[in-house]
Amino acid sequence: MKIHEYQAKAILARHGVPVPQGEVVSNATEAREAAKRLGGGVVVVKAQIHAGGRGKGGGVKVVKSPDEAETVARQIIGMQLVTHQTGPQGQRVQRVLVEQGLKIKRELYLGMVIDRSTERPVIMVSSEGGVEIEKVAEETPEKIFKEFIHPTAGLSGFQARKLAFALGVEGASVNQAGKLMAALWAAFNATDASLVEINPLIVTDEGNLLALDAKMTFDDNALYRHPDLKELRDFAEEDPLEVEASKFSLNYIKLDGTVGCMVNGAGLAMATMDIIKLAGGEPANFLDVGGGANAEQIKNAFRILMSDSSVKAVLINIFGGILRCDILAEGVIAAVKDLGVRVPIVIRMEGTNVEQGKQMLRDSGLNFTTADTMSEAAERVVAQAK
């Protein structure tokens, strides 16, 4: 689950991470009043959406007066902000963060994620703040420094000092950086976060460290332990089809292609998308119905697939284990009849009751195309999607 910048900063501040003073507002008048309360001087008006690249898209503006803050907020609130992470359709801005302006001496990077190879949290720092860490990793990987955190021992003082020296901070800022990293770990650990990122972490002219921007995402599987975090979820920022799929325990992610995919198992789903691309097509989605899906879930999955107007053909790739092939066939047949599906459907299934499932498809009187291998299925569905 993602949250907004202002929400992430509030969580980090509660755990001791220093952040700039600011207020989130939903209209231009409130922006002017917020700017007044922040001293009436230089403030930054920042669009709040679940995407990076807001500045380049025109969603972050520095202003010098409350009146200018009102004018800029009126321009930003309600705009369809397009960034490299939103796609060409953009994301509608519903609120802005009005934040105190600061004199910046240096911009650094500080982040924390789960490292899958070591199965431990890893804290990362870089002197190259203000740019995407992926770009730094690609172009100047030697400027990224990491420390792996033992999940029970936590972040050690010597690790924090080592990273502070790697950043090139000096004097009292070393201890300040150490305390900030400890606070970041506390927030990460306490909230079951999957990512915490401060980019940039700034050093002011006075030598103070502050989180100028913040991003947090959380493990959905742990949200039952954090009802307070669940309340921060902004459904307006999420794809409506993804929200609908989550109601039926379906893992759905919308993509930009024309071949709809329905698969059981995340690994098989990713392999299916790969083989569609190898066949010259583009997947329209990632859809994992899970190993124990029933006919009703299959029907709901189909309904969600068909809600995407870009889908020109559907590939169903199922390995029948807990989800038997006859149950799959029952759900698919019911969905196609009830929803009046008109796009071509290619089905490849193997496993429990596969012959029974294939016979049900043949007896349905519906125009399904079957395939025995993944490559055959991909070639057929790509041809029919053109």
Specify the residue positions occupied by each region the protein language model found.
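ATP-dependent carboxylate/acyl-activation modules
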Residues: 1-197, 202-316, 326-328, 337, ...
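Short internal beta-strands
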Residues: 342-350
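Short amphipathic alpha-helix used as the core "switch/output" element in two-component signaling
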Residues: 333-334
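Catalytic core of bacterial c-di-GMP phosphodiesterases, primarily the EAL and HD-GYP domains
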Residues: 321
